[in-house]
Amino acid sequence: MCSAGQLLGGGGGGGGSGGERDEDRDALAERAAAGTEQESGASPRRRGRRPLEEREQDIEESQNHTGEPVGDDYKKMGTLFGELNKSLLNMGFTRMYFGEQIVEPVIVIFFWVMLWFLGLPAFGLVALLCLVIIYVQQ
């Protein structure tokens, strides 16, 4: 049997020429590999490819803007109220339904705190103001 070097070299015999040819081929292969690495790293746009980080960022952006409704609707209220509302719902508070209007637990707690600090007359005034604003927007 013959080795892979002998098959590639085309010769089966001895001498130092077979070994030298293998070393030359190895050096050429290393230079070629180094050249392709430099080309691919130097200008990825020239070959029609973009770096991996940019491709991942584009994928994330396309997934965020798919046009589908967002499952977590607490983003509408802002981060602080949304997170508080999510925590209250997880603790067992429920949403209150007044006809077509849905009142989130964080709003109910907010009005209870206002009642505690401001008293009944101020609470009634603010509640009336909120109801007027809701019906004027419709």
Swiss-Prot record:
Keyword terms: Membrane, Transmembrane, Transmembrane helix
Comp. bias regions, Basic and acidic residues: 19-29
Tagged with keyword Membrane: yes
Membrane topology: Single-pass membrane protein
Location in or out of the cell: Membrane
Subcellular location, principal: membrane
Biased composition (Gly residues): 7-18
InterPro entries attached to this UniProt entry: DUF4605, FAM241_domain
Membrane-spanning intervals of the chain: 106-126
Bias-annotated ranges (Low complexity): 30-43
Region (Disordered): 1-73
Gene Ontology cellular-component annotations: intracellular membrane-bounded organelle; membrane
UniProt xrefs under PANTHER family: DUF4605 DOMAIN-CONTAINING PROTEIN, FAMILY WITH SEQUENCE SIMILARITY 241 MEMBER A
Family: Belongs to the FAM241 family.
Name of this protein: Uncharacterized protein FAM241A
Source organism of this protein record: Bos taurus
